């Protein structure tokens, strides 16, 4: 049976091209494929190719393999006895566009080497590792024998790291010295005991040192950062230099007498300005002011130049200095740090700080915050206060000078606030003269004044920008409001028009219904051939020049005429009807509408004028 007999010429041509391209010998399958695709030759060929790819993908795949690494003398034997699967190399240009993966590829030597290395790294031989390293080195976590002080030790790579770590854990400072060997650590004692307990410990310590030939002990200090400040009293240059040292084995030679002196009570039995163990910072500061006044401003003459010490905690002093509600009252912050063991403690306070010029300038231009660091505990507390207040510069200089240059105290540090950060401008040492102190204080006032002027200028510019932005935003909002109002008005107008159209349409519908109702009550017009004695002819003069003719029977009522006009859209509530008499008579007012035309002697021919009310 010839399957192509029922096909059209173009279909037979497409069938021929399809079978030639796809090598499909089954004409029934070919015709079915083309017919299912509405004889679209391109889609049929594409469907055939996709089916071929699908059949190819279902073939078993030859996976790429990575040979295992061979080791030792068995490498050749294992490689020869191992079954090597066939690997098919397919070039990229040989792959059809519709295929998304390669059948397989050969394993390169680099990949084999990489895998071998990974396998070797993953092998762990506990027995060989422990046997090779056990005799030469200590096991991890094993105890390292402790060396006696003064014994020379040959450093080894394995012991240097642990010894450095243990050494760093035993670091000390001059404020908290490390006790020597065979001596129990000293417990903190109150500085108000006038050195009684510490003196006895000092004697016992000296007795223990009589058998030694050295009069100095090596005390490790904190090696992380070494700050060196130029605090020579003979120089006027107050520049600060900070040096960094990374050596963890640094030591500082400290004499025993100096170590004991740091922990002893106030010199000469004086009452400390800030006692140890105070209950609150405010009480400590008030005690400082009372002791300072008793020492240096006890007479009426000196009381007039008493420095205006601030007696609230440091956060309150910072707020008073830099965050006053009135910007005109904002001032730099001045720290006065006293140290009773300094040789300048009395001279600087009486001759410089309590002088008329210095005290007056501080009273009007600074917020003066005092503290006493004679006691180590008070020094540590003050350093903590500075750290909490983010005043690292002040903390650094006070800490370093307290450890190395006590004669630099009393210290006056000038601090300003710039861009939400605190900066140390300068500091006055206990060896400075009144003129030098005045120069530095005036310089601090001038610098903070410049900072305030810059901040005020920036604040004004910021306020102007904000004002412009607010104005633009207000104008934009006003424009949006106006646009919204116009849109609402337009929407309202459209809504009103819609309602008006609906009303008119409704009225027209009602009028149409009314007309139909009224027209149903009007009798039929008599024919023209009716006797003249039985009919009347009425001519209607309509608004806008229109005319109409109608015949009525004489026995019909005048209401019939009114109903006829109403059916034409001229209802009596909107129009008036006048006859042709002179003067004109309104029909609805001068005639009884229930009477017929004969009773009212209506003329055989009448003309009615219809006028809009």
Curated annotation (Swiss-Prot):
InterPro entries: FAF1-like_UBX (IPR033043), FAF1_2-like_UAS (IPR049483), UAS (IPR006577), Ubiquitin-like_domsf (IPR029071), UBX_dom (IPR001012), UBX_domain-protein (IPR050730). It is found in: Nucleus; Cytoplasm, Perinuclear region; Chromosome; Cytoplasm. SUPFAM superfamilies: Ubiquitin-like. Residues 67-223, 453-472 are annotated as: Disordered. It holds the Pfam family UBX. The keyword Nucleotide-binding does not apply. Residues 137-149 have a biased composition (Basic residues). It comes from the Eukaryota. Forms a complex composed of ubxn-3, cdc-48.1, ufd-1 and npl-4.1. Forms a complex composed of ubxn-3, cdc-48.1 and/or cdc-48.2 and substrate cdt-1. Interacts (via FPK motif) with cdc-48.1 (via N-terminus) and cdc-48.2 (via N-terminus). Interacts (via N-terminus) with cdt-1 and ubiquitinated protein substrates; the interaction is cdc-48-independent. May interact with npl-4.1. This is UBX domain-containing protein 3. It comes from Caenorhabditis elegans.
